[in-house]
């Protein structure tokens, strides 16, 4: 019953913020090409979602690695839809890369469009990469970062699986750093039956960024494996420290 009430509250809250975002987009468009105003409204929405339940805890580590004046390609592990709001604890203006099917979800898809997120068709790999590079470089040029799940899909067992090359190709072509982010605890916030777990802790850790010079010079596959290993090691350490 409590979960149903909170879901209803979230629908009303998201509707309100969606209207605010549409107004902000129109009003700020002439001088806000990176859609920072819309993104900041999304951050307020996310903070509200996480802060109301009294026994939900969020721990954020490694923010000293974040330069708010830089654009990054953000890579993070993917377990559940809760990964998306959790990333808003990182103080950067970013655009998500998401599969086309998500943009077709009523209400949520419209929110992604307002936010300016990047839609790709995973069924057409070459076209998806072209779209990612074109749209990703556009947003980076405007001063935003781009957030990507390099595994390409959710992990069923909670481990970090093999990375795809798209995020690393974008970082190399755009000449920006890669910012690895590791999440733990998002998978347990919603139970398998769809009800909320009212006692939950999420930990987000930002790892040191990968310099653009290293991305440009190092073998792409070796670089992907190195970042993967660093993130996996961080996840194991976070779990040991629960």
Each PLM stretch: what is its role?
Residues 60, 74, 96, 204-206:
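Generic preference for hydrophobic
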Residues 53-61, 129-130, 186-188:
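Short gly/ser/thr-rich secondary-structure transition/capping motifs
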Residues 1-57:
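N-terminal membrane-anchoring alpha-helices
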Residues 21-40, 52-53, 68-125:
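Catalytic core of membrane glycerolipid acyltransferases/transacylases, capturing the structured
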Residues 59, 80, 104, 132-133, ...:
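Amphipathic coiled-coil/heptad-repeat helices and related helical stalk/stem segments
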Residues 130-242:
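Non-catalytic C-terminal accessory region of glycerolipid acyltransferases
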Residues 62-67:
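Glycine-rich helix-loop-beta junction characteristic of Rossmann-like nucleotide cofactor-binding loops
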Residues 61, 97-99, 120-122, 150, ...:
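Thr-Gly-centered strand-to-loop micro-motif
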């Amino acid at each position: 019953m409590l979960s149903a009430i909170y879901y209803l509250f979230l629908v009303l809250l998201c509707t309100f913020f969606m209207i605010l975002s549409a107004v902000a987009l129109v009003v700020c468009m002439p001088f806000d090409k990176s859609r920072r105003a819309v993104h900041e409204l999304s951050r307020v929405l996310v903070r509200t979602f996480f802060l109301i339940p009294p026994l939900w805890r969020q721990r954020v580590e490694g923010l000293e690695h974040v330069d708010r004046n830089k654009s990054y390609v953000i890579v993070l592990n993917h377990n559940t839809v809760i990964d998306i709001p959790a990333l808003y604890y990182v103080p950067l203006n970013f655009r998500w890369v998401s599969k086309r099917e998500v943009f077709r979800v009523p209400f949520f898809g419209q929110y992604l469009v307002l936010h300016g997120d990047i839609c790709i068709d995973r069924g057409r790999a070459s076209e998806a990469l072209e779209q990612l590079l074109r749209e990703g470089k556009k947003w980076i040029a405007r001063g935003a970062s781009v957030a990507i799940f390099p595994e390409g899909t959710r992990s069923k067992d909670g481990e970090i699986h093999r990375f795809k090359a798209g995020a690393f190709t974008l970082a190399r072509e755009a000449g920006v750093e890669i910012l690895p982010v590791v999440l733990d605890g998002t998978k347990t916030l919603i139970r398998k039956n769809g009800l909320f777990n009212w006692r939950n802790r999420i930990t987000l850790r930002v790892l040191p960024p990968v310099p653009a010079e290293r991305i440009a010079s190092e073998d792409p596959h070796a670089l992907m494996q190195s970042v993967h290993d660093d993130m996996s090691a961080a996840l194991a350490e976070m779990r040991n420290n629960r």
